[in-house]
Amino acid sequence: APDEGFWERLSAYHRNRDRTSLPDRILTAAHHYASGWEYNVIKPFNTFDEENQSIAESFTERLDGLTDLCGVNELIQGHAFFSDSPTALGRFAKLCGQLRFQIRWADTPRVPETSVLGHMFLVAGYAYFFSLSLGACPARRINNFFAGLFHDLPELLTRDIITPVKRSVNQLPSLLRAYELQELERRVFGPLSAGGHDRLVERL
């Protein structure tokens, strides 16, 4: 049966001002990491700002207070999101961040434009809500959410090749799939495995 208590739990969460629970701390860490990554992108365009360094350091200092959370320490090790040679996990996060700037259907003018990263999150959200409406168990809800969140990860490698183009040549879909798997292994799965993240690779 559909999860009848979802709305009540959602309302209770937003009414509760205590933000010290584990999920809230994970959300805080993700917020600071993403904000630091974004700031690192725009920082070179504002080199004359005297506060540049202090702003950049503020993100790392906030994350330093959350290093008891699994993965946070590795993400910021050596200021990973301000570094040209981050850890395996930091490198994967940087790769995923690139999808924020990759536009879907880039050759087809649309208003508003949508990014690949935004599309992936939207699919993940729908997958979770559809799972709720179907009465799926918690494990399936989580699996469906993350399947949606990473379903277009290969577009990091093949960029925006629209479906009509893929279908216009008989062998193109299979060739693209083979290339995607090869490059995912080389650029994503291989480095993560080498960095000790085999469990993450298995889930991806």
Regions picked out by a protein language model, each given a short descriptive name:
Residues S21, R25, I55-S58, T114-V116, ...:
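Divalent-cation-assisted or electrostatically stabilized phosphate/pyrophosphate-binding catalytic cores
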